């Protein structure tokens, strides 16, 4: 029976936490500094404690003042130095010290069981046990754990954390051999490049596409937003309760492919690194894209408000012919019996849509003493046709980063053939920490422009200014 298993967060063991909190490595300095008062005297020492000269069963005002000042100073220092220790005590036991002879991985809960045969072989070959866990707050727990020298050896997450975690010093860079570099798709390596180093192992790529209902849509999917008004009328004529298209148009993520189609960009680059001061969300192409979206709202093709859950629900009920979404939406459509296909996101001004490409990545914990072992497991067990096929069976990966497997899977799966075209036409989402500025600023701009509070140009220029100055 393999030791690989999915575990839920372990209940906190109070006695164990107390032992962890009191343990200090041999030769290490005390965690708390010596608390001192004026003149360098220790406030915890008894040598300086003497009564004021006016002590006659009471203290004079000056004596009370000095004692009060000392107490406040002691209190502030205690709070300052005890909060990090308190955080350490509150860390769940799954974030505690490393286990000898064991490799720990934080993983997607839907994929862990599928890897058991691969893990069993690794355990038999090496004698090293592999433990899979799926914390609910994987990214937050990982960042907190690494800061105190703990956590898993490997964590699987999207590439949007590359810059943040690399700059914070919580993930380790990897040395990529020419052989390994040639095995994986170039666009996958682009996602993990930051400040001249590679910060993780790419696993798979995915993007949004135009998902269309083959029953409702007769003929080829539209390539331009400008086609949708006439197409909507045509669909309604045959299917009165249906409309042509719906997506979460106020989402920076789902609408970006339209705005980027005519040349908008998030950040420019200086050599190979992103320049967060070179912002391209208010270009003429971006303005044209947002103007087209607003035209569809005014024409009644799109509703005046929308949520993503509504989009999925309407598509599953055949109330819309098309939506913009990703592979995560496929299972619900399959379950609902929808016969669907994929096409590139439509664009503006004759250009195809250019959506974001996301890459799932295996990161190495910089604090881990097992980095060599983790690299061995990832390079020779996971990034193989057998390993990635097992992961895909647990939950669809999208386009595997491994070229040999990508070619085989795409050849045999029509949906993956269509998704591959969308990935090839997309752009890798920026991986620097400042990308969060983009999502919040552009999201606000889309909201105020689509509800008529600002023109597309004014809204996007404000978003660009906010991205530069935050």
What positions do the PLM features span?
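Conserved N-terminal structural module of periplasmic/extracytoplasmic solute-binding proteins
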Residues: 92-164, 170, 178, 349, ...
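Short helix-initiation/N-cap motifs at beta->coil->alpha
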Residues: 134-142, 160, 226, 303-316
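A structural signal for short loop-to-beta-strand junctions that line the ligand-binding cleft
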Residues: 152-153, 181-215, 243-244, 351-354, ...
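Hinge/lid segment of periplasmic solute-binding proteins
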Residues: 159-208, 220, 225-231, 342-343, ...
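Short, solvent-exposed loop/beta-turn-alpha elements that line the ligand-binding surface or hinge
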Residues: 176-184, 265-288, 335, 347-355, ...
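Extracytoplasmic/periplasmic solute-binding protein
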Residues: 199-203, 208, 229-278, 320
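Glycine-centered hinge/linker elements that transmit conformational signals in sensory
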Residues: 232, 275-305
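C-terminal lobe and pocket-closing loops
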Residues: 328-339, 348-444
